[in-house]
Amino acid sequence: MSVTEMVSAKAILYKNKNTKELLAVDPAEGPVSVQLFGSDPEIMAAIAAQIQDGPYVAIDVNMGCPVPKIVNNHEGSALMKDPAQAEKVLTAMVKAVKKPITVKFRKGFNDQSINAVEFAKMAESCGVAAVAVHGRTREQYYSGKADWDIIRQVKEAVKIPVIGNGDVFTPEDAKRMLEETGCDGIMVGRGAKGNPWIFKRITHYLETGELLPGPTLMEVRDMILRHGKMLTEYKGEMTAMREMRSHMAWYTKGMRNSAALRCEINQVETLEGLAELLEKRMEAE
């Protein structure tokens, strides 16, 4: 199952023009959960009810986002400092819809307020169908190492499914998280950036014990082109090429001369130009 980008419930309410794109789902994506964020129980419940007939198998609530503009608006991981308000939001949403409500949160807001276990119990009491736990505090952002033991503690404290998140970059990481925490599922985030092969490799490794090789240079090149073509079809060539600049940093991470390649792509404005650059640079590798 995949999850949409997080979408502001208020933005949907006020018909922000960007929300339509964020809520869009292609049938080829398979099961998709839509992720909302917000702190107003009435608005969150109303929007959940409004979109529940959409192409989503579940509605997820982001209570773990560490970005300052979200936190300063008392949304995302700020709600970990206000579990009473979080409880109101989740209770209202569960009552408003028939589809499963899930919630993602962190270890805590900072090292002085590690409350993931209590937060999970609260969410379970509200009637949520599952929780996803990221093993870092909001204060950490993505620095340091994810604490998988907090995921284990949450798993032992609740009966609903627990999804582990944080520092899963390889199939071996995925297996180790399952073994060390007992979690019911794994959420891969940053580990998939520039590495869409990770899902197939994790699944194969867990099912067979065999570790599939990583992608070849030509497979990476072909995937970059495929990604660029799909973005172009979806957003238009100009926007697609601009967005591909950041994706290229992930696709080429660790490659020889990757810095030069990333510098050159900043000058690329067309899909044809991208193909020519990749042909020149990646064939040379």
Model-predicted segments: where are they?
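Alpha/beta catalytic cores of nucleotide-metabolism and tRNA/nucleoside-modifying enzymes
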Residues: 88-91, 96-98, 112-130, 142, ...
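Hydrophobic faces of well-ordered beta-strands that scaffold small-molecule active sites
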Residues: 2-4, 32-36, 59, 101-105, ...
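Glycine-rich, positively charged N-terminal anion/phosphate-binding segment
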Residues: 1-57
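Non-cysteine beta-strand/loop elements that form the S-adenosyl-L-methionine
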Residues: 4, 58-66, 125-135, 188-191
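Active-site glycine- and acidic-residue-rich loops that bind
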Residues: 42-43, 84, 105-118
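Conserved radical SAM core fold
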Residues: 7-13, 41, 63-77, 133-140
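Glycine-rich tight-turn/loop motif centered on a GG-T
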Residues: 68-85, 136-148, 208-213
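Active-site-proximal loop/turn and secondary-structure-junction residues that shape catalytic pockets
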Residues: 8, 38, 65-67, 101, ...
